[in-house]
């Protein structure tokens, strides 16, 4: 749990310092199929821990964010293809993933 706090704090700081260079509305990439971290409720809205963290980061940066969902297997390629601006996922860091994206 302590590591997650450090990761989310680092993400908040990184996003906060770069917010001025970003669009007014950011696209938050999320899987939405891994409860309780992320999933869809009965109305089709994305909910869960990852979504709450993403919303808190956006509020802290004072920017509007929209949610873009992606299948897990395509989430890193979608980020690299700029289908969303940042990724919120309870994802373990592996050498393969570190080679593809930056973690904060």
Language-model features: where?
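Bacterial N-terminal signal peptides that target proteins for export
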Residues: 1-9
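Ligand-binding "clamshell"
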Residues: 83, 96-104
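General helical structural elements
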Residues: 9-10, 44, 101
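Extracytoplasmic small-molecule ligand-binding "clamshell" domains
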Residues: 24-91
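General helical secondary-structure elements
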Residues: 1-2, 23, 93
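Ser/Thr-centric signal marking residues that sit
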Residues: 14, 25, 104
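Sec/Tat signal peptide C-region and signal peptidase I cleavage site
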Residues: 17-23
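Hydrophobic helical h-region of N-terminal Sec-dependent signal peptides
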Residues: 9-17
């Amino acid at each position: 749990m302590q590591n997650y706090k450090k990761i989310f704090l680092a993400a908040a700081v990184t996003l906060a310092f770069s917010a001025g260079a970003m669009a007014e509305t950011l696209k938050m990439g999320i899987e939405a199929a891994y409860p309780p971290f992320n999933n869809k409720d009965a109305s089709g809205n994305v909910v869960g821990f990852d979504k709450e963290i993403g919303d808190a980061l956006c509020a802290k940066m004072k920017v509007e964010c929209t949610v873009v969902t992606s299948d897990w297997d395509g989430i890193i390629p979608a980020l690299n293809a700029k289908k969303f601006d940042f990724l919120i996922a309870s994802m373990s860091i592996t050498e393969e993933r570190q080679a593809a994206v930056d973690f904060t």
